[in-house]
């Protein structure tokens, strides 16, 4: 977990890039995803190619940090938690229930909205992070527990 509150500036794209770099991301990043591939296979869900590409870029980044809003003294906790969740190398046992839920009837709802095959990848966001799926064409679909709409990125 990154506990320091760091000021970020610029437009939204610039801010997101700064946050991702602070969490360990860099241009051209490619990491070993064998732990994640095994996790998916153990749950009977072989990773799609787009899921593999996404994970090679983003798996293993710091999954919890604070996002400074208007004042550095107050900051929202931000999650970038991809399955399997590893916080300081320790597995979060709630993830199996989340993965199961996101692979069942919720997945059917996402695939219907997307019109293509999708896979769950985890939770991303702050306060109430969204459940996030990736489509076979690389689009991200997010659903929050407090709204009915499915968002596409």
Residue ranges and their predicted role:
Residues 134-137:
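Short acidic-glycine loop/turn motifs at beta-strand connectors
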Residues 145-153:
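Compact, glycine/acidic-enriched structural inserts
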Residues 129-132, 151:
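Short active-site-adjacent structural elements
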Residues 140-143:
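Short hydrophobic/aromatic-rich beta-strand segments that constitute the beta-sheet cores
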Residues 1-128:
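A surface-exposed partner-binding patch
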């Amino acid at each position: 977990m990154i506990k320091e509150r760091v000021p970020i500036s610029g437009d939204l794209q610039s801010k997101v890039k700064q946050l991702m770099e602070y969490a360990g991301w860099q241009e051209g990043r490619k990491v070993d995803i064998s732990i994640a591939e095994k996790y998916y296979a153990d749950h009977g869900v072989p990773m799609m190619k787009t899921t593999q590409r996404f994970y090679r870029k983003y798996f293993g980044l710091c999954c919890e940090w604070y996002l400074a809003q208007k004042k550095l003294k107050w900051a929202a906790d931000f999650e970038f938690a991809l399955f399997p969740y590893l916080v300081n190398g320790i597995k979060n046992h709630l993830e199996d229930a989340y993965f199961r839920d996101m692979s069942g009837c919720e997945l059917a709802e996402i695939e219907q909205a997307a019109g293509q095959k999708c896979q769950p990848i985890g939770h991303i966001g702050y306060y109430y992070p969204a459940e996030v799926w990736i489509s076979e064409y690389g689009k991200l679909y997010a659903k929050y527990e407090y709204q009915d709409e499915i968002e596409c990125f």
